[in-house]
Amino acid sequence: MFTIKKLTLTIVVATTLTGCANIGDSYRASLKNYKQYEEITKQYNIKNDWWKLYKDAQLNRVVEKALLNNKDLAKATISVNRALYSANLAGANLVPAFSGSTRSTAQKNIKTGGNSTISHTGSLNVSYTLDLWFRLADTADAAEWAHKATVQDMESTKLSLINSVVTTYYQIAYLNDAISTTKESIKYYTDISNIMRNRLAQGVADSISVDQAQQAVLTARNNLITYQLNRKTAEQTLRNLLNLKPDETLKITFPHILKVKSVGVNLNVPVSVIANRPDIKGYQARLSSAFKNVKATEKSWFPEITLGGSLNSSGKKLNSATNTLIGGGALGISLPFLNWNTVKWNVKISEADYETARLNYEKSITVALNDVDTNYFSFTQAKKRFTNAQKTYIYNQRITQYYRNRYNAGVSELREWLTAANTEKNSQLSILQAKYNVIQAENAVYSSMAGYYSVKK
């Protein structure tokens, strides 16, 4: 029976050591994989505060206020501190543990009476677990890597917050201009409507012309309502980011979107420049934490040796309690491998956690590469659309003037003029949106690469 148990234990330990070797190879391959992206990233200058390239002091203040007041970022900071406390707690197992106690008792014979017998005792104890197999060190390392991962989580939250603040800031700037342009359109159509009413009164126009002009006015007013609702939603988003309540004013004078100079994107920087992304750093840290946890759990097979010492004292009077000191020592050895079934499954659980962390890390690399690639493409398309929108607006202005002249000459209907004018006004709004889309797209690139990249000179 003992031989069978011994053989079973040997097989289990051998299997565990084999699994350890496989996980070690997998972990080293993952580190090598991250290293190649890190080396590519080092070839470029990185400006982490990319929003300052817009040279908008007001935007800078808004971002600073968000970093100071945002609740999601505050919660992420608390998570970082908590992980640090856990890491310190795990590290405490590497140093001796002290404890002490005192006790005073009084006894009296209730039958015979007399004086009470009073005694005072005290003890001071110390224990220390020898980390012969570095199990405790691996546990502490796992906790430290977990702390580093939460730091990167906070950086990811910060990165997302900044991107949201910048894009929402310029979204409101765009919507303000769209509202102003739409109000101009309403005035334009209202003027036409008034002219048609006067002509109708003079008998030189029919009622359908008045109806068509008024229809254009109402359509423009509905567009205005839509833009105002969108601005209110954007303001709500910005207020949430800045932690401002409805009765607190934004105190922001937004720029005109067409006057904002686009920073641009260096498209010569390869999409593989992703090592600065905090989410990837976080997944890499969690992978390291899981690996160290596997190492620590696998060492649960090995004996644990604990050294202990104590110093005890006693006396009948408090001031003489330290006159009698008794020292003691202890050596404890635990054999966890005897509980091999529990240890085995704990090892399996830690290995499964490692594999999950490895897959999450590998997925984060793929997602990041596709993220940058898609954002590059979106930026180039946004620039093209902005250029096309500007050209289209010029053509639409000409077409509107053409139909206006034809109407005034009596060879074209009002409907054709209004249709052309509506197309022109819409293309004017399209320019504003296209410019905002360029800013939004370039910020998506900066966010997905965690900074603005330029070639080192």
Swiss-Prot record:
Any one GO MF annotation of this record: porin activity
Gene Ontology CC terms: cell outer membrane; pore complex
Compartments (UniProt record): Cell outer membrane
Keywords: Antibiotic resistance, Cell outer membrane, Ion transport, Membrane, Porin, Signal, Transmembrane, Transmembrane beta strand, Transport
PROSITE patterns named among the record's database cross-references: PROKAR_LIPOPROTEIN
Signal peptide (from-to): 1-23
Assembly and binders: Homotrimer. Probably part of a complex composed of LtxB, LtxD and TdeA, which forms a single transport channel across the two membranes.
Family: Belongs to the outer membrane factor (OMF) (TC 1.B.17) family.
PANTHER family linked: CATION EFFLUX SYSTEM PROTEIN CUSC, OUTER MEMBRANE CATION EFFLUX PROTEIN
Domain text: The periplasmic domain interacts in vitro with purified peptidoglycans.
Function: Required for secretion of the LtxA leukotoxin and resistance to various antimicrobial compounds.
Protein name: Toxin and drug export protein A
Source organism (scientific name): Aggregatibacter actinomycetemcomitans (Actinobacillus actinomycetemcomitans)
